[in-house]
């Protein structure tokens, strides 16, 4: 019987419910259990694909092409699982499917209501995640905060789950905040008590409390919280601010969280103890890096940390492999000009230009890429970064001064980057990009092939609408650009590189989405190796 863990949050947002869910998932996975991660987002958008990065942060992409919440990236990296369309559900998706069923007549003329139709659909999504992944445990994070109007149907649905699948198969984990008042020099438990009271008022009794705090929570306060919330004191866990994400699951294990979960849900795990030896080695490495490598990220959304979270995580993963701390300096692409590029990049050891949409900042990207190419600074381009690297090469090496991307200039004569053929008649924006996992054939003797340890074929995740214009392939190759990765049908350019440079590689896909702390993605591994000048130092 599949077990279900629902992670909710109270008091304030951004408490780290996703990290809590991921940490529990990692511990259970390391006990030999198959874990499926799931995120419910209360917003009415179908998915975050059309949302401004400043509104939502990064859009994560799964193997099957789902555009999803960035928390799925945390799940994949921390738990080391692959997510799918069953892993991210929004209010928009729920209502869309309910209304489609109503239009088909599936409700036989009945009045469609939040209860039972919307709540039944939410429960169906939870159950479907279990069925389609054949999993032992589904861990579902409920976005938002207890008491939010938008979260109400989700809370009602997970309340009903306990009755429908049995209380022995459902566990509610509530993450809450214990603030420290510096003036009074004490922690306050009242917000937690009120949050649990609100949760209980809608019929959910939490089985475990995770107390987020910047200070250790004294035992007498845990006893008090237990008294007011009816949560056994042994099931009250503290989660302190940590210097590294790797600390969180280790702290949970020390507090016996995984054992409490398997005991509560009556799970007979294949391993009696979670094997966290490799995780501890990663934690030690992350805290005691010997070297430093400075990387400059030139992008469109640099003011928001979450906009490039997978990219920066992937850089750090590669840094662990070389025992080097990666110091990422982010520069707004719009701020870069021919006059200041030398000053802005004078101390960098590597340049990365990640993905994005629209025309803002393109000139700054091109200027920075030109400087990196001419001064042999290791460069990695991703998606839009690859497209701008191609435009830069056309303008400054092939001397096609009007070269551009059709996204920036639709009527451009030398459109080096063109709209994909199957996108020309596309009227909708949402969910219509080239999305998901696609193969690429790697050319022998290239840096790209070396990055992937000699593999002939790789599978990587994509999110784009434009592609390299194949009519320029021959001219590019004659001028020194190598097409080191091509789709199996030889149509779509996946990777370009200048092989005689220290490292100048750009990919149409998003390599950051498949990076893991203990397995850095190939292009990031090659990029940081070239930028740092260090040898691999395995931990």
From Swiss-Prot:
A matching Pfam family: GATase
Binding site for ATP: 14-19, 71
Reaction catalysed by this enzyme: UTP + L-glutamine + ATP + H2O = CTP + L-glutamate + ADP + phosphate + 2 H(+); L-glutamine + H2O = L-glutamate + NH4(+); UTP + NH4(+) + ATP = CTP + ADP + phosphate + 2 H(+)
Pathway(s) of this molecule: Pyrimidine metabolism; CTP biosynthesis via de novo pathway; CTP from UDP: step 2/2
Residues given in the record as Mg(2+) binding sites: 71, 141
Summary of activators and inhibitors of this protein: Allosterically activated by GTP, when glutamine is the substrate; GTP has no effect on the reaction when ammonia is the substrate. The allosteric effector GTP functions by stabilizing the protein conformation that binds the tetrahedral intermediate(s) formed during glutamine hydrolysis. Inhibited by the product CTP, via allosteric rather than competitive inhibition.
Renumbered residue ranges of the record's region Amidoligase domain: 1-267
Gene label: pyrG
Name the UniProt record assigns to this protein: CTP synthase
Family annotation (Gene3D superfamilies): 3.40.50.880, P-loop containing nucleotide triphosphate hydrolases (3.40.50.300)
Enzyme class: ligase
